[in-house]
């Protein structure tokens, strides 16, 4: 085992063009069990990551004597071809971590789940927004252009998953899910403006102000924010939560003490040296506020108990912070084509980010820590929270 790992490490540094390692069935089984055990021990994450990656490579490199439907024959060999280590670094680090952070939930086909929920949210959004030909057509076209630009719909999907975790119905949570997608999109439209981040691309295509002009983009953002409250007003109150509570939660999350507060702090931090606490304030408000409140309102739509709401609030807050740390990492590790927006813009604008303050590796560790915190917040729930666990892992592993 030591020899195999040593050869793999040497190859990953580019010292060997090709390595052939003879592996027997007992070794594979031992490695699998050891990886599963080590991955749960505090302070051993890096070893678990290495073992997990090695096992994956072995399992996908079938030797010439592999019997049909079985493990490779002991006499088989597995070519470990030279790896582009840097291209695998982000995916390997987070995927192996995600697999270990919460092993107790049942597997969820996250691709199928996201696609299904995205369709549900998009149908509802299409019904809530005025059609593109409704007068004044320009503003409604601009709203729809930005809203239906192919976003991942993570906030509304988390809202729906939170409702299901509390035993609620998707239909009751949909108004909140759609409202917070409108608020999120409004913030992006305004964030891309020349007076803010001055970005030309969003979600893989020209930003709203590049297509419709700056004035219409400002108004489209305003309209998306205000229609969010109209959509919330269509939700049904529950025994524990009134319409006033729904509207107040929405207003606070999008207002000057949360989302706007984060935007202001972000602008004021440009070009300055900020502390980690100051950066956390930006992330808590600019990103985590909307994400965590969408989770809270999903729970409220299901008439969540006080304990359930508190647990999901902790989950949403930790996940929102992890989401932004990953965003910071992706800005310096991915291409514009991959992200669908301008890569490296945070560095160019001298923005405060986790990689800039604590470094890339420490940022990855922080993202994992926050994701684990999100998983731990869900211990109150059983299988009904499997989708939330899967979504947390998905956000940790994402590459754009």
Predicted regions, residues:
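Mg2+-dependent prenyl diphosphate-binding active-site environment of isoprenoid biosynthetic enzymes
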Residues: 119-120, 129-379, 383-399
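Intrinsically disordered, low-complexity segments enriched in glycine and mixed charged residues
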Residues: 1-33, 51, 87-91
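N-terminal amphipathic/basic leader segments beginning at the initiator methionine
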Residues: 106-128
